[in-house]
Amino acid sequence: MVFKYLFFLTILAVSCEKKPVAGGTQDEAADVRIVWESPQQVVSTGGGYPRVHRLNDGRLMMSYSKSYNGYARFSEDEGLSWPETSIVNPMSKFTESNEKGNALLSVAVPDFAQLSENHPHHPGRIIFAGNYRPRSTDGKTTGLTTVHPYTISISVSDDNGKTWSDTRHIYMSDRWKENVTIGCWEPFVLELPDGTVQIYFADETPYYKKGSNWQNISVIESNDGGHTWSKPRVVSQNGSGRDGMPVVILLDDRIYMAIETSEPGTRLYPVVVSNTIEENWRTPVLKDSPYRFHPFRKSLKSDVVYSGAPYIITTDNYIVYSYQIADISDDKNDNDSRHAAMEVQVCPKSDAHDGCFDTMRASSRPIDLDQWTETAVWNSLCDLGDDQILAVSQYNGYVYIVRGKIILKE
């Protein structure tokens, strides 16, 4: 009888698990819209910060973090299936000890890129980047920076993701005199047309040394396919707050970088900074630069609404920009990542001129959810071709994808 009762409770729990449904447009007046299909769960036992990119052989690869490790899996059918048998573990947690104690170095916010088939040094190499974060060995306390600094690290594969190199640390913040959650964050990997490999990341290090909580976006570069890396140079800093969470695209002769930023009195909000490929951030893009701009018809800058964690891609005909938005209350204390939904806007590529675009529109939400009890956060996008996209989301602690099609409204 007890067994039957427990079996009934198990079935009830499974049947009552919240399942996401497809979202829709928030902007009925726009001339373009995204038609979303039903969300599909990919990782069955948790997972976060998912990213999907197409490989040179046509497959899709997804990176994500889970249980303090960095994982990847693959799809051979445009994202319809992601077999468990395809899972690999490019980057693993480890422990570190010194006179200050013991720390678990967990892998967070992984990203990757496959180098082009005509790369001058390592054609087809996959560079998997992760952010090692020091925490207590039980995982409950973050910021054990007296033991080990926050670190940007890579692992590489030269056989299309079958096997992976040992992990290498390529940028380390400082080991501080006290335990603080201060360091470097959120790597993003990009290859320039000449084969230069770039890793962008957010960095608090130089400011914390001076007693400030500012943060910049920096970049390090490799001219030999990932063997050696330059010292960081600052890409952007707004002069009064924090730039964070960089994601970068190439369009025509320019580099466009989506970031979240803030100023005194504002919540985090998304913007874009740009530079020519030739200029390549020789000087930082600062607050008043014409190449730091609001890409939306209606700016998301607010002292109440939170809209951070941006992502940007291009399709055949469009620029697509996503962010997570918490707008459920007039009280800003309710509007944070615990109550955020994924939102997406688009504009034609042809709207980009002179290093700027400001016509993003047709806001829509790939997953329809109750923001008081559900979240869709740390999202990303992937171009599938023919103006079809994947929205990729950490929905309630699980990895989901949603297929969408961008169409002109009749």
Feature annotation, model-predicted:
Residues 1-8:
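Sec-dependent signal peptide recognition
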Residues 8-9, 293:
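Intrinsically disordered, low-complexity regions
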Residues 19-23:
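Ser/Thr/Gly/Pro-rich low-complexity, disordered linker/stalk segments of secreted
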Residues 24-410:
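Asp-box/BNR beta-propeller blade signature and adjacent active/binding-site loops
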